[in-house]
Amino acid sequence: MHTKVYNLSLVTGAFALAAAFALSASAEGMKGPKTPYDLAKERLGSADPSHQKVYGGKDAPPGAFPFQVSLLQAEAKKGDEFNYHFCGGSLIADTWVLTAGHCVTSEGEILDPTRINVYVGSTDFKNGDRIAVKSVYRHPQYNADFTDNDVALLKLERAPKKEVKVGKINLIDATKDSTLETPGTDLTIVGWGTTEQGSLSRTLRYTSVKIVDRTECNNNILQNRATSLDDSLSGIVRSFRIPDDKVSAIRQSILDNAGQIVNENMICAGDPKPDPAAQFVHDTCQGDSGGPLVAKSSDKATQVGIVSWGEGCGVPKLHGVYTRLGKFMDWVKSTATN
């Protein structure tokens, strides 16, 4: 009878590397993670409205954010548009909408434009203008596993009707992108959805957030993900009889190998110093994806980011992550050409 002998360093090293990838990636199978469009399909008919939230937000007055748009599933019946909302976006030209790459993705593929409508000119899904989409452009380096290069453009079939009040948002000058490295900078997030109490709201909501140091943000997210691996670690310890003094070293190795999941293409924003007694902090959630992260100066709104991803919603120290628009302005300008 032969006794199987395991090389402890190889076992722990291989597990650490595999677990590190699991920490940094977000894939759910070969077709990638479920996207807002997929989740909205599943949600229809459900009594749970918690798919979309701006935590700690206020109702936006009519006309306050005239550039904000809603992405709808095209099969929505007239008058029922809100229930088919799955992402946000921003009007950047008469016939161009900026949104997130994951908003135009379903089962790993780019959505056909016939499956999307855009609703403009309303904060409450009343008396707005519903427009068909002609073309969908997702960034060529979009990475679903890491939600990287998370940006897309929609070419509309026509401009909004003249009687509908809309406005185009200014986009960040790429040469001024370095200002977004300063923690504490005030920004605004906008989106539709339920309040933090879970009551459904058809009114556009907004709240303020601050830029958070990217390294701090990254570390908080990794530590949160690492806790979910504790059960797996326990199983490995039992199977391979790893000494207790090695377990903490394995855990640290996992974190070290996971790298920067919040990279230079992203902005982290939230409540840097939340009230210790707070049950939630100002944040966006899934249904707000694709909407704008806005800087305001002298009553001028400038879009600096796009709602992209996060760990949960409104969780203290787990801040929202946004596409850093300044890194993609060359692509935006070259794509939205007419």
Where are these regions (language model features)?
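Residues that flank catalytic or metal-binding motifs in active/ligand-binding sites
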Residues: 65-67, 87, 114, 132, ...
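Conserved catalytic-core segment of clan PA serine endopeptidases
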Residues: 55, 116-162, 172-176, 183, ...
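Active-site-proximal beta-strands of protease catalytic cores
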Residues: 96-101, 180-195, 294-312
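Protease-domain processing segments flanking chymotrypsin-fold serine proteases, especially trypsin-like
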Residues: 2-98, 106-111, 116-117, 229-261, ...
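Conserved H-D interstitial segment of serine endopeptidase catalytic domains
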Residues: 39, 71-74, 97-100, 104-144, ...
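Extracellular trypsin-like serine protease catalytic domains
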Residues: 70-74, 205-338
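Extracellular/periplasmic catalytic domains that process cell-envelope and extracellular macromolecules
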Residues: 59-64, 91-92, 110-112, 124-130, ...
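Structural signal for hydrophobic/aromatic residues that build the beta-strand cores
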Residues: 69, 89, 95-97, 118, ...
